Amino acid sequence: MAGVSRAGIMLTGLGLTGAALTLLLGFTWAPTVDPSAWNSPEAYRILYWHVPFAWCSFLAYCILFIGSVAWYARRSELGWRMICTGSDLALLFGLGVVISGPIWGSAEWGVPWDWGDLRLNTYGLLTGVTLFLVLARGSQPDGQGTRDTIAAIGLFGFALVPVCLLYTSPSPRDLSTSR
């Protein structure tokens, strides 16, 4: 593990421990809600994992956006590393959202995915763009053309973030009654 600092290994271990503890507490000790009062199944606890995944994926897309702009503005190696890091994190957290969301949807509304719902489909497209970015980085020869293409697709992916946020906001309508 040449080139990996001791502090990096310790921070990674600490982060993974924190994530595991959060998962454990989210499913066992999270505040309980009377399901009969809230008309919600016991599966609501998945939201303690699902919602942070979503916010972290949006933050990862901000890293991807900043990296893409830095790459186009200065051909910065730091910008390219931000693109790589942002796309990896966005895929990790995006898959967490796409996996945990249907669990909640099945329990709450009886369907795991509603193909007519703009926010679900936009977020699915966003995760698909991220998957493409990660796979393209691994399968294409590293060069300026490849980096330009990946940065452009990263900018497109970031453009979907405000759409997802706009349609995810519960203020326009109560999401539980929209089904």
Model regions: which residues?
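Hydrophobic cores of alpha-helical transmembrane segments in multi-pass inner/ER membrane proteins
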Residues: 53-67, 124-137
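Short aromatic-rich membrane-water interface segments that cap or initiate transmembrane helices
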Residues: 41-56, 114-115, 119-121
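Conserved small/polar residues in nucleotide/adenosyl-binding loops
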Residues: 167-174
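Membrane-interface helix-loop-helix modules in multi-pass inner-membrane proteins
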Residues: 89-137
